[in-house]
Amino acid sequence: MKKTAIALLAWFVSSASLAATPWQKITHPVPGAAQSIGSFANGCIIGADTLPVQSDNYQVMRTDQRRYFGHPDLVMFIQRLSHQAQQRGLGTVLIGDMGMPAGGRFNGGHASHQTGLDVDIFLQLPKTRWSQAQLLRPQALDLVSRDGKHVVPSRWSSDIASLIKLAAQDNDVTRIFVNPAIKQQLCLDAGSDRDWLRKVRPWFQHRAHMHVRLRCPADSLECEDQPLPPPGDGCGAELQSWFEPPKPGTTKPEKKTPPPLPPSCQALLDEHVL
C-alpha cells in the first residue's frame, strides 16, 4: 500500500510538472513577418516556418510532438547543415526538438527553445534511414562514460566530430551545447584548426545530442542575443572545472518562477489563447 501511494504521488508530481502551458494551445504559426521576440528562455516567435518532415538529407524525430517550427533562418540552417553532411558522406542528420508554432515555454524538458532559434540534433549519423517507429520513439546513443569524464571510444567517431564542426563553422550559429566530455574529446582531436571550438560550450547532460543556437536575426528588433562566448577555444581551465567535484555546501539551484513575458509575447497570448 505504501509503495502504491508513493507511486501515485510520483505520478501526480510528474503530471503536474508536465501540465500544458498556454503556448501549447497555439497549434499553427502566428501569421506575419518572421520575428523572434525576447530571450531564448523567455520569448516567442511570429511568422515561424515549418521544417519539412520529408527530406533526403535529414529525418525529423517525434513528429507527434509537433516541435518542428522555427525562424526561417533555423529551417535554412538545418537544410544547409544536413546537405553538407550528406555531401561528405556522414549519414542522415536526425533532428530533435526545435520549437512550438509560436515558440514560448515548453511543459518540460527545455528552458530555452522559445524564440525559434534553437534545435537539438542527435549525435548519431545512421547510414540507413530510420523507420517511422524508430523516429517516433528514438533511442538516444549515450556517448559519455558512466563517470562523465570521457567519451565511450566505441561510440565516438570522426563523423560526429565533423558534424559538430560543420555546425560551429556556420555563420548563423553562436553556440553549440554539448556534454563536457564531448567538448574535451573535440579539443583533443581538433589539431591546429581550433577557432570553431569557441562556439562549442560544455553544459549539463547533452550526452547524446547537441543543442545548436543561432544568433538573433538582424530584423528581429525585439530579440535578445546572448553575449559572445569568451575568446579562445575553451579547452583550458574553464573546461577542466566541469570535471572537478562540487565544492562543499554546493546545492542545486532552486527552480525560479518564470519572469514576466516580453510585452509582445503577452499580447500574442492574449490575442490567440487567453
Swiss-Prot record:
GO MF annotations for this entry? metal ion binding; metalloendopeptidase activity; serine-type endopeptidase activity
Is the Hydrolase keyword given for this protein?
A: yes
- Chief location of this protein within or outside the cell: periplasm
Pfam families in alphabetical order: Peptidase_M74
Residues annotated as binding Zn(2+) 1: H110, H113, D120, H211
In short, the EC number is 3.4.24.-
Binding-site list for Zn(2+) 2: D147, H150
**What InterPro entries is this protein classified in?**
Hedgehog_sig/DD-Pept_Zn-bd_sf (IPR009045), Peptidase_M74 (IPR005073)
Q: Which GO terms describe its biological process?
A: peptidoglycan metabolic process; proteolysis
Keywords, A to Z?
Answer: Disulfide bond, Hydrolase, Metal-binding, Metalloprotease, Periplasm, Protease, Signal, Zinc
The UniProt entry's GO CC annotations, sorted and at most eight, read: outer membrane-bounded periplasmic space
Q: Which cofactor does it need?
A: Zn(2+)
Indicate the enzyme's highest-level EC class.
Answer: hydrolase
Could you confirm whether the keyword Protease appears in this record? Answer: yes
Here the disulfide bonds are C44-C265, C187-C235, C216-C223
Q: Which domain of life is it from?
A: Bacteria
The record's region (Disordered) falls at 225-274
In the record, the note on similarity to other proteins reads:
Belongs to the peptidase M74 family.
Tell me, in a sentence or two, what this protein's role is: Murein endopeptidase that cleaves the D-alanyl-meso-2,6-diamino-pimelyl amide bond that connects peptidoglycan strands. Likely plays a role in the removal of murein from the sacculus.
Q: What is this protein called?
A: Penicillin-insensitive murein endopeptidase
Q: Which organism is it from?
A: Salmonella paratyphi A (strain AKU_12601)
